[in-house]
Amino acid sequence: MSKDDPINSIFFEHQEAALCAQHALNMLLQDALYKWQDLRDLAIQMDKMEQQILGNANPTPGRSENMNESGYFSIQVLEKALETFSLKLTNIENPAMVDYKNNPLTARAYICNLREHWFVLRKFGNQWFELNSVNRGPKLLSDTYVSMFLHQVSSEGYSIFVVQGVLPRSDADDLISLCPVVPPKVTPKKEQKLEKVMTKFFNTVGKRLGGGSGAPPDSQEEKDLAIAFAMSMETKDGSEVSRSSAEIDEENLRKAIELSQAPGPSEPAEIPLLTRSRSSTPPGASEPFSNAEQQRRDRQKFLERFEKKKEERNDEK
């Protein structure tokens, strides 16, 4: 990557301890504005406020509802920190956020929580980037990937918060608006490997679900759809959180192919899905589908969208 690459203008913090909330806030705001001590003070302030509201005059010593010893902070702490910048966080499942849920690309940024790990999806210019402190740096995302990723993790019960308000202007905003980041070139060897994997993916999924001939994708958008779908498959133990994005891409794509070859609904199989947050299921909500049934539904939705894209392209011709 060249030193002059616009992506290098994006402020990025690497993971330290479990300070992902601090890193997420600073990367969202594009400056090293918050330290652990600042968020700790906010957490203590939030605890005292909650104790007063609940009338709990004798709280458990050393216990906090808004932080833990490892450095994790609650969404309430992040919300309080962003109030200074007139920014508001609203769960995408809130009925008021229906427009963002239907068209995620209309937002400027999202703060996401997966297994108590905070990271950011943020727009600079007209391009989306993943700012995740466990990665080596900012990751350029396609619009298709952003939409598919947010839809998938939201449907699995993870916490996605829409950032509302005007984000502080940064050098990266100005530079990338003028000079968009060019996606990295794929080497011939890597491209050949990707085509082979994609062909197998579409053939197996297409034949399993009756989605047509299962021809390999011939557009970048269709490739993005497949990769985004594969990326949504994560293991139950959360081991991916510490691995590089490139390793996760390849591993999850392989898993998606394996899942497409698993027994169908008439022969239930144990299929790893994104685990559901305990607090994410609203009271009175129905129990989630079985793993096999949910996986079948997700694959069916993906194939329907893929076939629709092909039909639209054929109509244009």
UniProtKB/Swiss-Prot annotation:
InterPro entries, per database record: Ataxin-3, Josephin, UIM_dom
Region named Disordered: 254-317
Subunit structure: Forms a complex composed of deubiquitinating enzyme atx-3, adapter ubxn-5 and cdc-48.1. Forms a complex composed of deubiquitinating enzyme atx-3, E4 ubiquitin-protein ligase ufd-2 and cdc-48.1. Interacts (via RRDR motif) with cdc-48.1 (via N-terminus) and cdc-48.2 (via N-terminus); the interaction with cdc-48.1 is not required for atx-3 enzymatic activity. Interacts (via C-terminus) with ubxn-5. May interact with ned-8.
Record bears the keyword Transmembrane: no
GO biological process: chemical synaptic transmission; negative regulation of TORC1 signaling; positive regulation of ERAD pathway; proteasome-mediated ubiquitin-dependent protein catabolic process; protein deubiquitination; protein quality control for misfolded or incompletely synthesized proteins
Pfam annotation, one family: Josephin
GO CC annotation: cytoplasm; nucleolus; nucleus; synapse
Record's compositionally biased regions (Basic and acidic residues): 294-317
Keyword tags: Cytoplasm, Hydrolase, Nucleus, Protease, Repeat, Thiol protease, Transcription, Transcription regulation, Ubl conjugation pathway
Enzyme class name: hydrolase
Outcome after substituting residue 260 to A: Loss of catalytic activity
Ranges of residues in domain UIM: 219-239, 247-264
Residues at the catalytic site: 20 (nucleophile), 117 (proton acceptor), 132
EC number in record: 3.4.19.12
UniProt name for this protein: Ataxin-3 homolog
SMART domains xref list: Josephin
Places the protein is found: Cytoplasm; Nucleus; Nucleus, Nucleolus
Region (Interaction with cdc-48.1 and cdc-48.2): 296-299
Gene disruption: observed consequences: No visible phenotype. In response to ionizing radiation-mediated DNA damage, the number of germline apoptotic corpses is increased, ufd-2 recruitment to nucleoli foci is impaired, the number of ubiquitin foci is increased and rad-51 retention to DNA damage foci is reduced; the increased germline apoptosis is suppressed in a ufd-2 (tm1380) mutant background. At the higher temperature of 25 degrees Celsius, 60 percent of animals are uncoordinated. Shows resistance to heat stress characterized by an increase in survival and expression of heat shock proteins such as hsp-16.2 and hsp-4.
Compositional bias segments (type: Polar residues): 276-293
Primary subcellular site in the record, as a coarse category: cytoplasm
Tissue: Expressed in germline (at protein level). Expressed in spermatheca, pharynx, dorsal and ventral cords, some head neurons, hypodermis, body wall muscles and coelomocytes.
Physiological role: Acts as a chain editing deubiquitinating enzyme that binds and cleaves 'Lys-48'-linked polyubiquitin chains, with a preference for chains containing four or more ubiquitin molecules thereby modulating protein degradation by the ubiquitin-proteasome pathway. Probably by regulating the IGF-1-insulin-like pathway, regulates lifespan. Regulates germline DNA double-strand-break repair and apoptosis in response to DNA damage by recruiting E4 ubiquitin-protein ligase ufd-2 to DNA repair foci. Interacts with key regulators of transcription and represses transcription.
One Gene Ontology molecular-function label: cysteine-type deubiquitinase activity
Reactions the enzyme catalyzes: Thiol-dependent hydrolysis of ester, thioester, amide, peptide and isopeptide bonds formed by the C-terminal Gly of ubiquitin (a 76-residue protein attached to proteins as an intracellular targeting signal)
Residue ranges annotated for the Josephin domain, each copy included: 7-178
